[in-house]
């Protein structure tokens, strides 16, 4: 396997959801729907371990861009040569600020000053869990990813989560289908669409969609995402109006999010086909916390996403938080260069 030589940056946004000033500003701009759902805005106090994992398991990273509304963790070492502190106003156009929508933060990432063409986007709940190499994210200058296809299934409505993220990803797919033909993409690079990186059901799904002009849907993989900055700029060039409409102060159910970049990379064959099967995504709950701790201890999965859940009560959350902190402290006991 040839070694990847391009510079690779990491980007991770973060907000101190327990900051009274942030909560006050949020409620000022949204008085009709103030913060009441703690499941959406809990601070588990484990973010420092994200950086310890990066130093231990991805020491090759070029730069780490920490994106916030201007408030940074008090323990962050601003003098760290690998760390770049980015405020929303440093790259997001003023007309979109202040913003409380992750979509606005994500859709403008190409404007982050100094960001490399090749970067990996993390949410602050996505942790590297074992040694990774540049080739886990990019090969031949292309993002490693698995274009596992599926037929679109209508999401079910939930009174708390409403329509969820699937409606937004439906919008992402619709935009991609406006600009690309599935038939043309497969003809251009058939091994991208029928290669050994696809497992049984996914390979069968690709066969079932043979000859279709439009893409149906791609399996949702909630983990860190390798991206090309040039693809983000291309989407802005092609769909400026819709991208601007998606950069709202608060998340809208009908809008685009960063998955449009992933789908665009697939449709334009700008990806390196990979299995990407060593990733885990688990909801944070009292019933799942021991499973999470086992994954952390075993270190078999290369990364793990710890999804917040609105169904986790405050009492349960305290128990989960204590157990998580114990597990992370045991796995990463030493401070990283990113900490004071």
State what each model feature region is.
Residues 1-120, 127-340:
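ER/Golgi luminal nucleotide-sugar-dependent glycosyltransferases, focusing on the catalytic module
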């Amino acid at each position: 396997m040839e070694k990847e030589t391009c510079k690779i940056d990491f980007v991770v946004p973060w907000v101190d959801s327990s900051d009274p000033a942030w909560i006050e500003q949020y409620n000022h701009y949204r008085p009709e729907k103030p913060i009441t759902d703690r499941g959406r805005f809990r601070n588990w106090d484990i973010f420092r371990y994200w950086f310890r994992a990066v130093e231990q398991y991805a020491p090759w990273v070029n730069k780490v861009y920490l994106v916030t509304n201007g408030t940074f963790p008090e323990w962050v070492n601003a003098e760290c040569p690998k760390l770049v502190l980015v405020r929303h106003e440093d790259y997001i156009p003023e007309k979109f600020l202040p913003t409380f929508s992750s979509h606005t933060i994500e859709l403008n990432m190409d404007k982050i000053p100094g960001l490399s063409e090749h970067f990996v986007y993390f949410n602050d709940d996505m942790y590297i869990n074992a040694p990774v190499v540049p080739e886990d994210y990019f090969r031949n200058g292309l993002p490693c990813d698995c274009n596992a296809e599926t037929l679109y299934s209508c999401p079910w409505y939930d009174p708390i989560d409403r329509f969820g993220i699937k409606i937004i990803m439906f919008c992402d797919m619709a935009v991609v289908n406006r600009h690309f033909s599935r038939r043309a993409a497969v003809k251009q690079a058939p091994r991208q669409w029928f290669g050994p990186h696809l497992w049984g059901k996914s390979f069968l799904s690709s066969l079932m969609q043979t000859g279709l002009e439009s893409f149906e849907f791609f399996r949702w993989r909630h983990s860190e995402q390798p991206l090309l900055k040039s693809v983000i700029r291309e989407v802005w060039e092609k769909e400026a109006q819709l991208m601007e409409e998606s950069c709202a102060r608060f998340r809208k159910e009908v809008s685009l999010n960063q998955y449009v970049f992933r789908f665009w990379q697939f449709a334009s064959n700008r990806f390196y086909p990979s299995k990407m099967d060593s990733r885990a995504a688990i909801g944070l709950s009292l019933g799942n916390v021991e499973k999470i701790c086992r994954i952390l201890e075993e270190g078999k999965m290369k990364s793990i996403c710890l999804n917040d859940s609105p169904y986790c009560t405050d009492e349960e959350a305290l128990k989960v938080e204590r157990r998580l902190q114990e597990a992370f402290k045991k796995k990463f006991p030493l401070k990283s260069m990113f900490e004071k």
